[in-house]
Each structure stands twice: as structure tokens, then as C-alpha cells.
Amino acid sequence: MLNQKYVYLVAVGHFFCDIAMGALPAILPFFILYYGMDYSAVAGFMFASSFLSSLVQPTFGWLADHTSKTWLMSLGILLSGVAMGLVGLFEDYWSIFALVTVSGIGSAIFHPEAARIINKLSGAKRGTALSIFSVGGNGGFAVG
């Protein structure tokens, strides 16, 4: 049986986690305009956010499969949002790179545990639950 209330709650968490991931492409032009960075420099931020977080995500997937750590979802949302929010306080490249990396790792922490929870909450309606979860993430990315 679909536990609709909690599926929507996890989808809201997905929304807030993915706001940070959607914000990064939107702020790249500001780094170029105000900090004098070039396109290859800001491409490094996308590398930090996407590629580096993808490298560690399987580790958190393994952890989600072997231990139930639902608090990892909260940690992931917190890291993702706070680190991306702190980006605006720094002007030097490597500080921003580090914060973007931490934000991406927050996203990598959130997604496997959240996917595990969605599967558990879905009952026989896995497609419906996953769709609701996905709408949350896509909405967050769009708002970001």
C-alpha cells in the first residue's frame, strides 16, 4: 500500500536538495561577470558538482542497501543547501570549488537513501511513488 503522506514528504526533501543543483548553472554567468573567471574555470564547478559527486554516490548507495540510515537524507539536504548558500560569501576559485563539491556530495548522500525509502513506501505502486519523488527533484532543479 502506497504511504502517500511520506512519499510526498520525501519528494519535498528531494525538491530542497535539488534546488542547490539547479542553482549552480544559473549562477555560473555571475562568476564570469563579477569575478572575472573564464568558461573553463566555471566548467570546473560543474565538474565538481556532477562528476565528483557521482564518484562517491555508489558508496552511499551501498550504505543505503546495507544499513538503514534515514538521517542521511537530512544530512544530504543540509550539506547541499548550506554549501551552495555559502558560495556567495567567497570570491576565490578554490573555496567556491570546495563548497560546490560539498554541495554535490550532499546530493550524493541524499539520493540513494531517499530512493530506498521511496521504494519501501511505495507498496505495489512503485511507478507512482517514483514519479512523485521525481517531480520533487525536477521542481527543485527548475526553481534553483
Task: Please tell me what each predicted stretch does.
Residues 36, 68, 89-94, 123:
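Helix-breaking motifs and short loop linkers at transmembrane-helix boundaries and internal kinks
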Residues 22, 50-58, 141-142:
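Residue-level signature of mid-helix packing/kink "hotspots" within the transmembrane helices
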Residues 83, 94-102:
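Paired small-residue
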Residues 14, 46, 50, 77, ...:
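Small-residue-rich transmembrane alpha-helices and their cytosolic helix-loop interfaces
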Residues 99-136:
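Cytoplasmic helix-loop-helix junction between adjacent transmembrane helices
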Residues 24-36:
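Membrane-interface helix caps of multi-pass secondary transporters
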Residues 16-24:
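Conserved extracellular-gate-facing transmembrane-helix segments in secondary transporters
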Residues 55-91:
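Conserved MFS/SLC helix-loop-helix module at the cytosolic interface between two early adjacent transmembrane helices
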